[in-house]
Amino acid sequence: MSDGGGFTGVDLLAEKYYSISPYAYCAGDPLNNVDPDGRLLTDFEDGDGNLVKHIDDGSSAVFQQTGTGVNLHYELNGYNPNSDGSKSPNLTSAIQEQQQLNLQNPALQQNAEGYNETHCNQATQNVMKTVDSAIDNKTPIVVNGRANDMAATLSSGKNPNYLSVSESTASKNAQNGGLSIVDYTNPNPSKSGHIATYSVGVNILEGKIANIGPSSYTGFVPLNGAIGKNKP
């Protein structure tokens, strides 16, 4: 990994930590509220309220699709009144399903607008929006801009939600269901960098990174498939 790379994510205990490396993750993430008996369901719905998927994760949360085009994402839309499940959303499920929605969204594919463009920043922002909708945080976790802009913000400490960690810690956090982000800053300001989220939940079985970018590298891919070791 070059000096221009980094790993970032939501730090829910931001006041206790400070960015100390190019890597970050959700420190002390309390969002993995999974019912050990696995008998209660999170619902994921389309924009019209039609059921897309049940996930047996112990929560009674309802996430609904909102936005259009590159901005299509899930947001918490309350809790199922007919369920005795936890009133805490399971963020592992939310991140997992948003990553899958990104990959299914034709607007996020390379050249969707006819300019050979890629949409890694919007895909990552969609995951951030999903998480942001489901947590009670004073400062929004969504980071705007292109990939280079997002990487600069994440590494600067300007957004107090993010904590810098090693790659191995970012990976472990994602394995535990937390939000971890990898970014690459292109040293040529006229060219794009790259940013992506670590796979969580069942997505990990498909690949370490949930990557949106050039078509040949879009999908659940190894880290080196998302951010090549030989980048300048």
Where are the regions that the model predicts?
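Short turn/helix-capping motifs enriched in Asx and small/polar residues
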Residues: 1-84
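Loop/turn elements at helix/coil->beta-strand transitions in domains of secreted/extracellular proteins
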Residues: 4, 133, 176-179
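Structural recognition of the beta-strand scaffold that forms the well-ordered cores
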Residues: 7-9, 24-26, 53-54, 126, ...
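N-terminal capping segments
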Residues: 76-144
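...with weaker cross-activation on analogous glycine-rich loops/strands in unrelated enzymes
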Residues: 138-219
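Glycine-rich, aromatic-bearing surface loops/beta-hairpins
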Residues: 212-232
